[in-house]
Amino acid sequence: MTNSKQKGARFERYVASLFRDYGYDAKRSVQYCGNTGDAADLKDIPLLHCECKHQEQFRIYDWMAQAVHDSQKSGNIPTVIFKKNNHEVLVTMRFDDFMKLYKEYECSTSFGYCMNPPEESDE
């Protein structure tokens, strides 16, 4: 495995660990064992098709095009998670997809569902 492939694999494992820190059972996809083409870099993340990139040269539109193409079969939201050396991890997605997520958040929190699920009534 070349250094750049190792760096990419390390970053994918790192991002999966970040998701696990938030309670998701994220794992790195093993793309060289038959999961190619439409496979995300990470699996078991609800709603998102994640492409992970740890590169110094940013080609964000190319990366997003890859995520959009590869997510078509699953219907998940194409998302690019990226960083460069000595910088924080960032996430990008299409604006319409962001607004769908934000609207879902807004609807769920307006009734307090995110923090406190509604109690069942005895009536």
For each feature predicted by the language model, list its residue ranges.
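Catalytic phosphate/metal-binding cores of nucleic-acid and nucleotide-processing enzymes, i.e., regions
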Residues: M1-E123
